[in-house]
Amino acid sequence: VTTTRAPAIATKPQPAAARKKQVRARASSPLPALLYTDTGTSADQLYFSRGVQVHDPFIAFEAAGKRCTVQSALEFGRVKKSRCFDEVLPLEEWVERAWKAFPGRAIPPGPAEIIATLAKAKRLSGFRVSSEFPAGLFVKLRELGLQIDIAEGPLFPEREIKTPKEAAAIREGNRLSSVGFSVVEDILRRAKIRGQQLIFENQPLSSERLQLAIRAAILNEGGRADDVIAAGGDQACDPHECGHGPLRAHELIIVDIFPRVMKTGYWGDMTRTYLKGRASEAQRRLVATVAEAQRAGIATVRAGVDGAQVHQRVLDTFAAAGYETRRSAKGSVGFFHGTGHGVGLAVHEAPRVNTQPYTLKQGSVITVEPGLYYPGLGGCRIEDVVQVGARGAKLLSSHPYDWEIR
């Protein structure tokens, strides 16, 4: 695998906003975008809404290059004052117009009739929607004569390129992760070892206790970490096992913290591995190899590189150290997940860094999170977030790697 750098390009680097426009120009359908969801569950809706948060489903769409939305009286004033949309339309008025456009109805017009009425008024023949668009609404809009195209890939592919402001928001998410790790380290330092047990404040230390402490600390700093992984021993060998029950001394504990910043909606995503007690040589070698693989992966990241090449560097590092991946009817051991994924308004978004070819773009933000998992020995994963640059990766996360706590 080549590790040589691409030759320097003499042209002036484009700002992130310009790169976003170039990516957007390659959207799979020329039709304007349409969304009907809320900003709490939809990263696309939050992106399109330029950060203003509305927690009930609402109509948002493009018309003549403008971002438009329909809001009830409850939200109209707040959304209007935010200036996040180019045009804010009152829902009540458009319900009345839909009544007239579809006379004889026994029930008030729903989203489909309102959207169809809007489309006629705005002289729009149809819309482009995401694969997550409500199926019933999709069918109804087509029945009403609108062309509805499902986007091939992301609805807003330009989301992949992060501006400096977005990168700072993701860095804040990772700062919250670091807050959580500091809490974990403090608890593990204060915990006492009694045989194989870990005792904290006169109680057995459990995964749930760690998870609760992490959530509380992050909430106090302005974030939410609803799902936290704090899994020890063989539980940690299932990468998405959250962890439950007592944690044991001298066993590896994977802590994966992916908080959302409540103010902005952007996510962080970091993982560290810990052990309270004394590690065996096999455990130390496992952790050292994962750390080496992560360094190799990060060193390979730069604009224009195939993400599969980053993944291969991780695989090569593990193979050179003698760690095998095996699959069976009972599950897998070794390294059996991707090296990374995009992070932004969703904790998992484009691009994916795995065996599939994909050219990394300047400004993309990805995780690099290799791991090794062997029941009986334990699991280790180390994860950081980087922004893809023309000459390499820029870390957007920071926390020490001190993992063995006596």
Predicted feature locations:
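Active-site neighborhoods and metal-handling regions in enzymes and metal-associated proteins
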Residues: 2-406
